[in-house]
Design a protein with these regions (language model features):
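Structural recognition of the beta-strand scaffold that forms the well-ordered cores
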Residues: 14-19, 43-45, 63-66, 86-88, ...
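Ligand-binding clefts/hinges and TM-proximal coupling segments of bilobed small-molecule sensing domains
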Residues: 70-87, 125-129, 156-177
Length: 177
């Protein structure tokens, strides 16, 4: 995640589409977004069979998040209220292994990404019901206004696949929705 942002800001990449949630804060800091292509929220997952059933069970424990992510912001917003600490990781697979291995009690991540990983890899985790926040749209992001043509082409292509039904087919195939 951080490497993608740095590459774009350094001009080594023209844009990124790695689950970049469209937020006012990101827009204010110079991100330029396409139209939203998927609404996603963040939620909490625990090791399969864990006694943790909600945020209130995290008191005195540590949770994992990806550095500089929406899930990190979400967990940080809950930490004081529920008495847990936040531990930062650079990628989801390492974070998930920390949950399964017991180094942390839970993790926060984008719900569709986490659900897909659990399903596809069989990793011993489960998403805790009732822990999701309000969804935000993912967008294709650029950091240089000279690349506006990329955003325009992306938006046109997105509109086309939504209009002809291809978008719905992709979502159904890969996300089961």
């Amino acid at each position: 995640w951080d490497a993608s942002i740095a590459a774009c800001q350094a001009g080594q990449a023209d844009g990124m589409i790695a689950g970049a949630s469209i937020t006012d804060g990101r827009k204010e800091s110079g991100w330029i977004f396409s139209d939203g292509y998927y609404d996603a929220n963040q939620s909490m997952a625990v090791a399969t069979g864990s006694d943790i059933k909600g945020f209130e069970d995290l008191n005195g424990k540590s949770v994992a998040v990806k550095t500089a992510s929406m899930s990190a912001t979400y967990a940080e917003s809950l930490a004081d209220q529920y008495g847990f600490t936040v531990t930062y990781f650079e990628d989801s697979p390492t974070m998930y292994q920390a949950v399964v291995g017991g180094q942390v009690a839970a993790c926060f991540d984008d719900t569709p990404i986490m659900a897909s990983n659990i399903k596809d890899t069989g990793i011993g985790m489960e998403i805790v019901d009732g822990t999701g926040n309000d969804p935000a749209a993912y967008g294709f992001a650029i950091f240089n206004a000279d690349n506006q043509e990329l955003i325009d082409m992306f938006n046109k292509g997105l509109a086309n696949i939504k209009a002809n039904g291809t978008y719905d087919e992709i979502i159904a195939k890969y996300l089961g929705e």
